[in-house]
Regions:
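Auxiliary Fe-S-binding modules of radical SAM enzymes
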Residues: 1-136, 302-305, 312-387
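Conserved AdoMet/S-adenosylmethionine-binding subsite of the radical SAM
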Residues: 201-359
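Short Fe-S-cluster ligation motifs
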Residues: 151-170, 206-224, 381-383
Length: 387
């Protein structure tokens, strides 16, 4: 594996972290955090390989890029490989990273199968649960505004994420499958989603390697939302040979098929669970059947690996959204750490037309945030280390 930071670079990185986010160091003294994020921690510390790397070493017999294979054929190969991957990954972790250096990469791998399926899901597009059917490979954008091009607006070491994640090698992709009226990243998600830099998957891999070598604890795929970019992100893993945890930072409004493609590749999940009901989701983000889809996928993510769930407290929405969200988390994702976020501010359409959305036209009050904390405390949710 590539060495990360050396000498003065390591000292500078440590000093910066200590001065800017000392909690990013002290959080690992919390035994609950370390236990619940144990896989992520091991990959972050280079004690275990990231899942995507191991997926490149699991061979498959057929050429997944062959036009002779139907999607049904590919899914059969995928699901068989998924079962094999669990024991394959466990065996490699038991022997350590040096085991990988003794293996030869196969002609075609489990990762290749995922890549092939992902591109087929683009045309007509059914990657997210809008299932808009856009012919993206023909250059026709979906509801998310993304077509066949990989668009990145920025990438950097994010110092404002949850303590276990900082510094986070964050990549902001253009476009989003939500239409949130209060979006704080509305410029890249809705207004000018295609004005970023157009990259190839190879170039995206270079960005990830650069971020890791300069001290990133993880690669944080975000946006907008990264979901429309799944095919490009998966292909970038073919060219990425540095060990780094992959983090999925998303609204989770994706199909089961898309979730299956991600599940054996992502090391830590950072999903949003925004709303406690479908009415609020439709009125504020213009998505249907939100509750069933988001909770289904977050439950799958929880069962697949380490997870920190985010919930943004909206003004006037504690009873309709915050309470049911936290109650669901306590019942269904007991290992999750939860970031109860208090930084909502009116942006985008709400800021320009507060009369249209008076319920969310202000910041949350202190008593609303404190009520959210009391609800979480009563449910036994662990939120303080990451909120």
């Amino acid at each position: 594996m590539t060495k990360l930071l050396l000498g003065s670079e390591m000292v500078d990185w440590f000093i910066t972290l200590f001065n800017v986010r000392p909690d990013a160091l002290s959080v690992w003294l919390d035994p609950v955090v370390k236990e619940r994020l144990s896989h992520y921690y091991s990959v972050m510390k280079n004690e275990k390989p990231a899942r995507f790397i191991v997926a490149k070493y699991l061979p498959v017999d057929a050429n997944p890029y062959s036009s002779d294979l139907t999607q049904g054929d590919l899914w059969s190969i995928h699901d068989k490989s998924s079962e094999e991957f669990k024991s394959f990954y466990k065996d490699i972790c038991a022997e350590g990273l040096e085991k990988l250096s003794k293996l030869e990469k196969p002609s075609y791998s489990y990762l290749d199968v995922k890549i092939s399926i992902a591109y087929k899901l683009m045309n007509p597009c059914r990657i997210c649960e809008r299932k808009c059917g856009a012919l993206r490979l023909e250059g026709k954008p979906g509801v998310c505004s993304i077509d066949k091009e990989l668009i990145v607006h920025s990438y950097f070491h994010h110092m404002g994420e949850e303590a276990p994640l900082v510094p986070s090698g964050t990549i902001f992709y253009g476009g989003c499958n939500f239409k949130c009226v209060f979006c704080q990243n509305y410029d890249i998600s809705q207004v000018r989603p295609r004005d970023g830099e157009k990259l190839t998957p190879q170039e995206l891999a270079t960005v990830q390697a650069y971020l890791r070598r300069k001290g990133a604890r993880n690669i944080n795929h975000v946006g907008g939302d990264p979901t429309p970019h799944i095919p490009f992100i998966l292909e970038s893993f073919r060219y990425l040979d540095i060990n780094v945890p992959q983090l999925w930072n998303s609204n989770m409004y994706m199909t089961i098929e898309a979730m299956k493609l991600l599940e054996d590749l992502i090391d830590i999940w950072l999903p949003d669970l925004k709303y406690g009901n479908d009415n609020c989701a439709w009125r504020l983000s213009k998505v249907k059947n939100y509750w069933e889809i988001a909770t289904r996928n977050i439950k799958r993510a929880h069962d697949a690996g380490d997870i920190i769930i985010r919930h943004l407290v909206l003004p006037n929405h504690v009873e309709c959204c915050t309470r049911p969200v936290l109650e669901w988390i306590a019942r269904n994702t007991p290992r999750a750490l939860v970031n109860i976020m208090d930084q909502y501010r009116p942006e985008h359409i709400v800021a320009r037309h507060p009369e249209l959305y008076p319920d969310v036209a202000r910041r949350p009050k202190l008593d609303e945030i404190e009520l959210a904390y009391r609800i979480a405390d009563g449910l036994g949710i662990i939120y303080k280390p990451v909120s």
